[in-house]
Amino acid sequence: MAGLPNSSNALQQWHHLFEAEGTKRSPQAQQHLQQLLRTGLPTRKHENWKYTPLEGLTNSQFVSIAGEISPQQRDALALTLDAVRLVFVDGRYVSALSDATEGSGYEVSINDDRQGVPDAIQAEVFLHLTESLAQSVTHIAVKRGQRPAKPLLLMHITQGVAGEEVNTAHYRHHLDLAEGAEATVIEHFVSFNDARHFTGARFTINVAANAHLQHIKLAFENPVSHHFAHNDLLLADDATAFSHSFLLGGAVLRHNTSTQLNGENSTLRINSLAMPVKNEVCDTRTWLEHNKGFCNSRQLHKTIVSDKGRAVFNGLINVAQHAIKTDGQMTNNNLLMGKLAEVDTKPQLEIYADDVKCSHGATVGRIDDEQMFYLRSRGINQQDAQQMIIYAFAAELTEALRDEGLKQQVLARIGQRLPGGAR
């Protein structure tokens, strides 16, 4: 792959950050580093990177600095939620800021052992970067038949540094949900300050037979941050997984969700809401493999694009040859709020089996004039009318959040990104 003009400089810096950790890194992390160096960074000429600008990131001077945060500072950034909370600061687990997990139903160990984690479903260069620079793996297990009373909240706090340097932090987690288990896991990403930083995130999840997963991702970082994430879900027979991502902050945010349905009668829901404002770019990508028959999947991805923002959606459903009775649907709906706002959408199907029911679709539009006229004629001012329409557009996604307090906090974040909000 042809690299960016400054690709070599960025790769050299990342290599140096890896070597600064000495010889304690796992063989798997070393292999990912070698793959990163062999692959190089993509350019706009590469189809999958055509709309994701990298120049503002790769010409940076990277550092890896672990800051200290007090409980009061953590609380100022935290969600108000009754959950078992694990806190990570600048890529590192901080036990003093985290809850004890004994008796919670979650077994947690943190080390650099990667023997039991699955291979990537769809590997690419920034996945290799996070796998190589993440200093440890958070191993989470929920035993057979267990149903923890509280959600597990993974809170990630990344700080920028003064000057031209960019602090880089990489987070690596793995969850094993055993047979018949049920759990809710929330990823929460925030910025400690207003300075630039670069976050890499990788989360792999095994959902065993008859297990049920509720996964929520909240990307609430600052408007000059870069965030590249790769989540993999693997489902066995009769497993269920619901994944909801709210991508609400970042100069460049690229979120990948890759899934394999490896058992019959599994059920999958993948939803996302992205709201790029000003000059932000939000790139949402899904890759779904229906590898066994009698499975059901639904995807709903929505974007609300303001100012000069750009939203990108690229999704693919692949139905294997023997995956009969597959029922898969993927929908991407986009609402443009500015004359210079842009959307690029590419939903795709690859079907190699007979007797399946699959569909995909995409819509791009602006606020309906008749809707606006109806609201204005009832004495509602233009800004309030716009906000009502936007909240209604997002409601199909926000209403899927079971916890009312969490839903209200997501709605508040949406409100900050609306015209007139504090962005």
Where do the model's predicted regions map?
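Conserved beta-strand/loop scaffold segments within soluble protein domains that form the structured core
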Residues: 116-380, 394-397, 401-423
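Short, low-to-moderate order helix/coil transition modules at the start of elongated helical scaffolds
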Residues: 1-202, 210-212
